[in-house]
UniProtKB/Swiss-Prot annotation:
This is Kinetochore protein Spc25. The keyword Cell cycle applies. Component of the Ndc80 complex, which is composed of Ndc80, Nuf2 and Spc25. Residues 51-86 form a coiled coil. The lineage of its organism: Eukaryota, Metazoa, Ecdysozoa, Arthropoda, Hexapoda. It comes from Drosophila mauritiana (Fruit fly).
Length: 222
């Protein structure tokens, strides 16, 4: 009887150990499953973190490129502003120079016209400005006690021989040739300047303030 009871107690202990082992194996399997799931989730998280890091790197690269591009645009705009300001200053300086040149040109023209007027009265020579520079047209008046002598001329502006002949003729009549030639030269300069920058007539291409005198015109007396 005692032996039967001892075996029964042993069987219970063995059964309890077996059941405990089964529970431990079940817990171990459950724990292993959880560990596997945790590792799997951890791997997914790591992969997601890597993908995110790659995206962040790409975004940082794009951001850096955009920032460099923006810096270049800012520098370009600043350079344009500086160039624009320099251009404005150059334009103002150019306008001032043009204004000064125009003022000096008007002053010079007024002085020349005054000289022409004075020389015209002194030499008694009157020039047709509309005929210049292609032709030299006018008249020299030699004043006398009883009557005046008129010497008209209408000629091309390149006749050197005609000029020499006229100068000799007027000089023989006591005309101040230095003043007379200065008058013609100034009148020619005014005519040339007034027609610039238009193309000068073909006849005046080689004009050098030289007068052509037509000595075939008769001398008039009044």
């Amino acid at each position: 009887m005692a032996i039967i009871m001892a075996e029964s107690s042993y069987e219970r202990r063995v059964k309890a150990l077996y059941e405990k082992q089964i529970r431990m194996e079940a817990l171990e399997a459950k724990f292993i499953k959880k560990v596997y799931k945790f590792n799997s989730n951890l791997l997914d998280v790591k992969e997601a973190a890597c993908r995110h890091q790659r995206k962040v790197g790409k975004l940082q690269k794009v951001l850096m490129e955009r920032r460099e591009e923006l810096d270049k645009r800012v520098s370009f705009i600043e350079e344009l502003d500086r160039e624009l300001e320099a251009t404005k200053l150059r334009d103002l300086a150019m306008k001032d120079r043009i204004k000064q040149q125009k003022m000096l040109a008007r002053q010079r023209k007024n002085e020349i016209m005054e000289s022409i007027h004075t020389l015209s009265k002194t030499t008694g020579t009157y020039i047709n400005q509309d005929a210049l520079p292609a032709r030299v047209k006018g008249v020299t008046v030699l004043r006398g006690d009883k009557r005046n002598q008129l010497i008209p001329f209408d000629l091309k502006s390149t006749d050197v021989e005609g000029l020499d002949s006229l100068c000799q003729h007027l000089e023989s009549l006591n005309v101040d040739m230095a003043q007379w030639q200065q008058l013609i030269s100034l009148a020619m300069d005014v005519a040339m300047e007034s027609r610039a920058p238009t193309t000068p007539p073909k006849e005046a291409t080689n004009c050098n303030s030289i007068i052509e005198i037509d000595l075939t015109s008769p001398t008039c007396h009044i």
